[in-house]
């Protein structure tokens, strides 16, 4: 078996990636989320495949086909709710994974980090298009509002929006193409994940100290396979509790009403995992400014290696920047809350303050804290 594992052209790639991979001896549970994201992706592809067997991407029958899946297909209700809540679990793992990367300075592995940002955009695009497919009220109006943002692009905006819609409004052509893209994107994401791993294995994993761990490596299997398996069990338990006991807790009741272009819902909002970005978008009165802020809220992650001023990699031994980090986490929770609130006083001013704080912490306060820590520890 060892000979096959180490000599076979295909199996040896798996061996070098998941079995004999040298890993730091001290990586904590925060390093579990990579494998959990892989599990989420597999769950989403499998449940999505079974849903696609019964779904019809036509405005007249899309809503009915989802109802049919839930009522008439064997365990269709389970597959549908696993897919819907699987997206939420995916984003929870994604946010924790990115948060870990920021905390421990993993963004210094620039190729891996940038590929991660591309993956984040791809997953967000996939989730947005997936939310449109059941063709409920929030599906339709969410698609209308978000795609309409592209009309803020000077000169070509309106043409671009109509090109994406395939007409003069969100209609059958839009739904059909969104289904096609929603189906193909997870496979593109899988390919990008392999590139992400390829870049990671070029440098090796980071660790909680932020120090070079070449002198103290252990094989990935069995140490981290068993550790990842524990993470998998915990995730599956949380996922099953969410899916079987509270399937609709993260959804919007408006999406149980079929799409009606003549009736606008009182509060149009995206799924919970986009609310922080939606709050940043709404905090700027100008349409183009809002769109730029929305894009920048994610793109700013790509500038983190440039904004790193500390002589230390991780925040483990940096209490001042740690404080800034946790204020940033709290700020993102505030933005998520504000994104789900109506556009009225006092929510507008809270959203604007939280948006300014978000960019200020990343661009100004954390780099300044890094320089200050260098000074007080004489690391110049």
Curated annotation (Swiss-Prot):
**Do you know which InterPro entries this protein is assigned to?**
Cyt_b/b6_C, Cyt_b/b6_C_sf, Cyt_b/b6_N, Cytb/b6-like_sf, Cytochrome_b, Cytochrome_b_C_euk/bac, Cytochrome_b_N_euk/bac, Di-haem_cyt_TM
Record annotation: effect of changing residue 238 to V? In strain: Isolate 1
Q: Which residues bind a ubiquinone?
A: 201
Membrane association type = Multi-pass membrane protein
The record's subcellular location field reads: Mitochondrion inner membrane
- Kindly give the SUPFAM superfamilies that the UniProt entry links to this protein: a domain/subunit of cytochrome bc1 complex (Ubiquinol-cytochrome c reductase) (SSF81648), Transmembrane di-heme cytochromes (SSF81342)
**Which CDD domains does the entry mention?**
cytochrome_b_C, Cytochrome_b_N
Q: Which cofactors does it use? A: heme b
Asked if Mitochondrion is a keyword of the record, the answer is yes
Q: What is the protein's quaternary organization?
A: The cytochrome bc1 complex contains 11 subunits: 3 respiratory subunits (MT-CYB, CYC1 and UQCRFS1), 2 core proteins (UQCRC1 and UQCRC2) and 6 low-molecular weight proteins (UQCRH/QCR6, UQCRB/QCR7, UQCRQ/QCR8, UQCR10/QCR9, UQCR11/QCR10 and a cleavage product of UQCRFS1). This cytochrome bc1 complex then forms a dimer.
The family database entries (PANTHER family) matched by this protein are listed as: CYTOCHROME B
Give the protein's function.
Answer: Component of the ubiquinol-cytochrome c reductase complex (complex III or cytochrome b-c1 complex) that is part of the mitochondrial respiratory chain. The b-c1 complex mediates electron transfer from ubiquinol to cytochrome c. Contributes to the generation of a proton gradient across the mitochondrial membrane that is then used for ATP synthesis.
What protein name is recorded for this chain?
Cytochrome b
Q: Which gene encodes it?
A: MT-CYB
């Amino acid at each position: 078996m060892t000979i096959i594992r180490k000599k076979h052209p295909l199996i040896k790639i798996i061996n070098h990636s998941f079995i004999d991979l040298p890993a730091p001896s001290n990586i904590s549970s925060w390093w579990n989320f990579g494998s959990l994201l892989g599990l989420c992706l597999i769950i989403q592809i499998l449940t999505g495949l079974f849903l696609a067997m019964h779904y019809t991407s036509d405005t007249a029958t899309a809503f009915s086909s989802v109802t049919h899946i839930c009522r008439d297909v064997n365990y269709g209700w389970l597959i549908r709710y696993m897919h819907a809540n699987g997206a939420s679990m995916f984003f929870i793992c994604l946010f924790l994974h990115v948060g870990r990367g920021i905390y421990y300075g993993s963004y210094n592995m620039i190729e891996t980090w940038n590929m991660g940002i591309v993956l984040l955009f791809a997953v967000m695009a996939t989730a947005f298009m997936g939310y449109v497919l059941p063709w409920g009220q929030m599906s339709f109006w969410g698609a209308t509002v978000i795609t309409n943002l592209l009309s803020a692009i000077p000169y070509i905006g309106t043409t671009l929006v109509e090109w994406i819609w395939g007409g003069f409004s969100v209609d059958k052509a839009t739904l059909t193409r969104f289904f096609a893209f929603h189906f193909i994107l997870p496979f593109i994401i899988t390919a990008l994940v392999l590139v992400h791993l390829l870049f990671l294995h070029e440098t090796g994993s980071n660790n909680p100290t932020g120090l070079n761990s070449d002198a103290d490596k252990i094989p990935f299997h069995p140490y981290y396979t068993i550790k990842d398996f524990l993470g998998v069990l915990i995730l599956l338990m949380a996922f099953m509790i969410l899916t079987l006991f509270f399937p609709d807790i993260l959804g919007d009741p408006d999406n149980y009403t079929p799409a009606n272009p003549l009736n606008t819902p009182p509060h149009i909002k995206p799924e919970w995992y986009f609310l922080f970005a939606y709050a940043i978008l709404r905090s700027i009165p100008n349409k183009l400014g809002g769109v730029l802020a929305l894009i920048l809220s994610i793109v700013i992650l790509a500038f983190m290696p440039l904004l790193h001023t500390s002589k230390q990699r991780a925040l483990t031994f940096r209490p001042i920047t740690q404080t800034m980090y946790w204020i940033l986490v709290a700020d993102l929770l505030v933005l998520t809350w504000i994104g789900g609130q109506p556009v009225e006083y006092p929510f507008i001013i809270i959203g604007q303050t939280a948006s300014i704080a978000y960019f200020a912490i990343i661009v100004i306060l954390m780099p300044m804290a890094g320089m200050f820590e260098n000074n007080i520890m004489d690391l110049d």
